[in-house]
Amino acid sequence: MIKIYAPASIGNVGVGFDILGAAIIPVNGSLLGDFVTVKLSNKFNLVNKGIFSNKLPKNTEQNIVWKCWLKFCNTIKRNIPVSIILEKNMPIGSGLGSSACSIVATLVAMNEFCDKPLNSKELLLLMGEVEGEISGSIHYDNVAPCYLGGLQLILEDSKIISQTIPNFKNWFWIVAWPGTKVPTAEARDILPKKYKKETCIKNSRYLAGFIHASYSQQPHLAARLMQDFIAEPYRIKLLPNYLYVKEKIKKIGAISSGISGSGPTIFSISDNINTAQKISAWLTENYLQNTTGFVHICFLDSKGVRKIG
């Protein structure tokens, strides 16, 4: 038996649309992500458990786990009869890399179960392919940090897909999911097909500056440059009161904030735990729309996916 945990992640990290992603873990030590358990069986079998298992497709062949299993078997050219348990603890369409959690956990579990026929690069490529089939385009800004941990810069080079970027150890990342859903495909469709040259230059300047500030360990510069000129101006239509919320948490003391992935989860950053707790309390009171929503104060998760059983 193999049991794998894969963490939630923040896609884009504000300034890096489809280029940056960060794995997160609550500061209280709890695990925020999905679990996948693989056992030997005489045929494929899938059991869905967890908080959000009732949101998964009833048809097994529409489940991400089945798609991962099939793609893995086709890749290694072997049919592997297994029983898989998916513990779905991440809300679907939340902007926290929910699909990436299931993809990464399943493919790593299958690879471990089969004595690692695929290397880490081959696995990551496979993860990107499955993510692309679900969302409409291959992107690694959730699967890479979920798999590798930390803050990842997505290069998509044939030899180097992703590189780990230094982060700031004293940053607290507050993530707030309101309890609603924004499908990734819908959030991508709302974006323009073309951008003005000035917008592209400005976004490139801020992204380059953020990477420089990360390597030179200038937290205030990095926080100031975490602005999104590509997706946020259009996706705010999908997030009622987003600009109001962003302004309020800035007044409380957030040094940066933005939309996590496609939303509706938003993230904010503080370099002080007391301020982080105040932001968390305000978001809990004012951003959550139902009882399933949540707010977590997190660190970046440097481990990424891991075997826990």
UniProtKB/Swiss-Prot annotation:
Gene Ontology MF annotations: ATP binding; homoserine kinase activity
Keywords linked to the UniProt accession: Amino-acid biosynthesis, ATP-binding, Cytoplasm, Kinase, Nucleotide-binding, Threonine biosynthesis, Transferase
Location in the cell: Cytoplasm
Swiss-Prot/TrEMBL catalytic activity: L-homoserine + ATP = O-phospho-L-homoserine + ADP + H(+)
PROSITE patterns: GHMP_KINASES_ATP
Pathway: Amino-acid biosynthesis; L-threonine biosynthesis; L-threonine from L-aspartate: step 4/5
EC number: 2.7.1.39
Broad class of the protein's primary localization: cytoplasm
Stored Pfam families: GHMP_kinases_C, GHMP_kinases_N
Amino-acid biosynthesis recorded as keyword: yes
Name of the protein described by the UniProt record: Homoserine kinase
UniProt source species: Buchnera aphidicola subsp. Acyrthosiphon pisum (strain APS)
